[in-house]
């Protein structure tokens, strides 16, 4: 069996579409339990103050679709409207529940999205 080199992997990735790359990143994040978001550098003196502020109130929320419920088609429509995904991608997201629908959104946006998803029959969690 031939050994795959780094050059082979880079060549393969170069030929992927943006959508395929996005899906690959999401899969890698889930597989290894990491985030592709750039880490934020904080000055050592400001770290305790920033940690205290973060403990007071969370500003970014993740919308997690736990299950689609009985009205799967309605949930897919709402997921498409919220995320801008295509039909196949939205269906795959709904079929693969529990999955993150949106990440790093404001509390208002998270609550609004949860309301829309619950009204369509989905079971949703905000983290």
UniProtKB/Swiss-Prot annotation:
Keywords assigned: Ribonucleoprotein, Ribosomal protein
Any one Gene Ontology cellular component term annotated for this protein: cytosolic large ribosomal subunit
Compositional bias per record (Basic and acidic residues), positions renumbered to this chain: 105-117
Transmembrane segments: none
Pfam families recorded: Ribosomal_L12, Ribosomal_L12_N
A GO biological process held by the record: translation
UniProt-recorded Gene Ontology molecular function terms: mRNA binding; structural constituent of ribosome
Organism superkingdom: Bacteria
Region (Disordered): 101-127
Subunit structure of this chain's protein: Homodimer. Part of the ribosomal stalk of the 50S ribosomal subunit. Forms a multimeric L10(L12)X complex, where L10 forms an elongated spine to which 2 to 4 L12 dimers bind in a sequential fashion. Binds GTP-bound translation factors.
NCBIfam families xref list: L12
Similarity comment: family membership: Belongs to the bacterial ribosomal protein bL12 family.
Function: Forms part of the ribosomal stalk which helps the ribosome interact with GTP-bound translation factors. Is thus essential for accurate translation.
Protein name stated in the entry: Large ribosomal subunit protein bL12
Biological source species: Geobacter metallireducens (strain ATCC 53774 / DSM 7210 / GS-15)
Gene name per UniProt: rplL
């Amino acid at each position: 069996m031939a050994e795959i080199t780094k050059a082979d992997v880079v060549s393969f990735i170069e030929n992927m579409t943006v959508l395929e790359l996005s899906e690959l990143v999401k899969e890698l994040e889930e597989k290894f339990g990491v985030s592709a978001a750039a880490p934020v550098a904080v000055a050592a003196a400001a770290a305790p103050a920033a940690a205290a502020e973060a403990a007071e109130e969370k500003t970014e929320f993740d919308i997690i679709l736990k299950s689609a419920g009985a009205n799967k088609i309605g949930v897919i429509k709402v997921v498409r409207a919220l995320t801008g995904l295509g039909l196949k991608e939205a269906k795959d997201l709904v079929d693969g529940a529990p999955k993150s629908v949106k990440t790093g959104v404001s509390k208002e946006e998270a609550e609004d999205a949860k309301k829309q998803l619950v009204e369509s029959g989905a079971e949703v969690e905000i983290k």
